[in-house]
Amino acid sequence: MFSILKKLFGTANDRTVKKLFSEITKINSLEPAIKILSDAALKNKTVEFKEKLKNGATLDDILYEAFAVVREAASRVCGMRHFDVQLIGGLILHRGMIAEMRTGEGKTLVATLPAYLNALTGKGVHVVTVNDYLAIRDSASMGKIYNFLGLSVGCIVAGMTDEAKRIAYNSDITHATNNELGFDYLRDNMKYSMQERVLRPFNFAIIDEVDSILIDEARTPIVISGPVNDNSALYGKIDKIIRLLNDSDFEKDEKLKTINLTEVGITNIESLLIKDGIIKPDTGLYDFENLNLVHYVNQALRAHHMFTVDVDYLVREGKVMIIDEFTGRVMEGRRYSEGLHQALEAKENVKIQNENQTLASITFQNYFRNYHKLSGMTGTSMTEASELKDIYNLDVVAVPTHNKVTRIDLDDEIYGSKQEKYDAILKLIRDCYNRGQPILVGTISIEKSEELSSILNKEKIPHNVLNAKFHEQEAFIIAQAGRFKAVTIATNMAGRGTDIMLGGNPEMLIEQLNKDRNYVAKTAEIKAQIAEEKQKVIETGGLFVIGTERHESRRIDNQLRGRSGRQGDPGKTQFFLSLDDDLMRIFASDRISGVLRTLGLKNGEAIHHPMISRSLEKAQQKVEAHNYEMRKNLLRFDDVMNDQRKIIYEQRTEIIKSKDSYGFLNSTTEELARKIVLTFMPLGSYREDWDIDNLTVELHRIFSIKFDHNLVHKNDVTEEDITKLVIQMAHDIYKSKEEAYSSELMNNAVKYILLTTLDQVWKDHLYSLDHLRQGISLRAYAQKDPLSEYKREAFNLFEQMLNNLKELFIQTVYHFHIDLRHLQKEDISLEHKKLQKNMCESREDPAFSKYNAGNSIETYLKPVVLRVDPKDRKPDDPMSWGRVSRNELCPCGSGKKYKYCHGAN
């Protein structure tokens, strides 16, 4: 019944596309008038559009004409004219939706339409890609169109200076990677002035490969962190013990990806820990004094039995590097959290880095929800349409192809064992190679790609291997995978974003000839050669894509298939499976094994059965649902932190922007004074119950007030009188500092103290939340909802953090005993910059800042200690010396140079 209705009325997607096609006629009707414009007149359209917007027009009012202008500019500058289906893609993106467009349909060119239109507002547009290569490539190629029309273009890649980034972000259109955008957002919110920040307020983002960024990478938050205590020796000791365990000591569940010690395992590991002197005799692993070791043992177990080298990570140049399970790429700068990375380093016998403490973090889910408008493009997102709608409120619209898809998708072939499967794959590769048909073989891991490469080497079949180990050549290798007789092995979607053209990619080959004297002649030669090769490849049947396993996600399988048959080219795809494959073994083996027994499968024989295909699809749906739940759960927890993060970041920005810090100081002083007085002189209490001694101590600790006991003994004095007196005394202390150093200088110093104190308590709060998060799931055993418990406790911790902020801030301000008479305003600004430089530029990679996680507020205040007049220095009081040059005589009077005396330490 449903299928009949679909045929009659079409799907919701069909109806949306039909509506959009009616708008395309309006754009096309403007083409003749736009086409006859001179270059100068065409460029001037940008000025006209901006003027219209200034006078109250909306983007939708100028949409059709703007799209027609971009189409004509692209035709003149790049020789590429937007097809009607590309205009549809542009409309979808402008309206804040996701355009699903097949591989080779020109998504990069599509983005120019909404990017140009939305950049006319002057608020900036971010075009987001998955790696630096694509960001550089797209900004260079599409930037010609924007520049022709008078718009500026920027490109953000790793390693740029803040000044260069600031210029790029202030461009009308900025191409950047998702990682750099996220890290720059976090870094900006660790800076000390608005001038040092690089990002503008969020406006509009167009995400290329949107499924990869918003779904595949959503489970991994981006983190700026700093090292904490060095526990590398303990990781090494635990690793040696874990190696001695056998299979009966633990049980693992591959479906749930969990591993736990058995009772026997606990007994064995306790005896080994006692033997090595790690725990005391007669104590157990789960005794209170040893509970911290459970974490190390669990992570070492996971490292050895749940993570596989060249599948989940690789070892390069003495470092453990994470492999993205979806793309096969190395995730530069990423480290597993909670000690897992250290456990892997111990397992692989490489240098163990310190554990990290989070200084700032955010998930891509919450980062991209900051944008006023968000849209994206991908070749495959319909399978995740509900998730994109639920989490990001993004609708997915499938755009028709410009040319009909002629690719043939063959049925899966299922074999009894991995060896039989490889034999069948080898036979097909040999057949294709002999007739010259290019082949792309997709694997799910580096390990599998190297295994297959080894088989082809033995058979003397020339081929290229594309995986995380060779990512530098990624774009070039994948671009030439469509050449005559080419055999390419690629992990998953490595090289995604680069088209595979039949006969080869002329632009990539020409790029290598830039420095050749015979550049022009060779360019023509290459184009002719590729045109000839393309015809030969078409005659062989086009690109043949072979999948060696089904991925957990149907979308990844579809992406692999989509490599073949671009823009109406011929091609074939086929998956080869075996009962040894992870997906089959873990999720579908029982059901499929029963079918195979019924059919009586013989050695080396393949089967094609609808029930097996259905079973595989159900298994994939099950895994997809599980992964979706994980991402949704991560978001639920991160939303708690995100609410707090927004408050802190907004507060921090207000502090930086404010010209007067006295308001916050004044209100906080009054609040703390009232709180302290009422603590030791409770309302309604008798005078003899007042704790004046401790009140005196506390007032000196917080405000540096020397409180006179006799003031309390006056007749008729009340708690309110004492509170007012304390507030006045605190104000007098501040006023005396202001008179000594100038109000402007004190205002800058107070702002600096407030910012550094806020950073300190926020960092400590994140540490507390990390610990709370790690153990919160155990509340489920007490019939409590972990999320509700996390929300409640996180709120309590946040309140506690705000109280700590106020106390630490006030205490630091009122205990200023530094001689600031010679301190200039620009000196504080300079010290801000130095501190920020140390925070951001000393990191090893974007996710691992060496910003000292252990610094106290006193450490942060060191930069304020600058020049002091030598005659004001007291020999027996180093605090009065201020900054001393290393080659000056030491102020203590020893006669030695400062660097050899008190400065030696």
Curated annotation (Swiss-Prot):
Q: Does the keyword Protein biosynthesis apply?
A: no
Q: How does it sit in the membrane?
A: Peripheral membrane protein
List the InterPro entries hit by this protein, alphabetically: Helicase_ATP-bd, Helicase_C-like, P-loop_NTPase, SEC_C_motif, SecA, SecA_CS, SecA_DEAD, SecA_motor_DEAD
Question: What is the top-level taxon of the source organism?
Answer: Bacteria
Query: Can the keyword DNA-binding be found in this entry's annotation?
Result: no
Could you tell me the EC number(s) of this protein? Answer: 7.4.2.8
Q: Where does ATP bind?
A: Q86, G104, E105, G106, K107, T108, D499
Biological function: Part of the Sec protein translocase complex. Interacts with the SecYEG preprotein conducting channel. Has a central role in coupling the hydrolysis of ATP to the transfer of proteins into and across the cell membrane, serving both as a receptor for the preprotein-SecB complex and as an ATP-driven molecular motor driving the stepwise translocation of polypeptide chains across the membrane.
**Protein name (database record):** Protein translocase subunit SecA
The species is Rickettsia typhi (strain ATCC VR-144 / Wilmington)
Q: Which gene encodes it?
A: secA
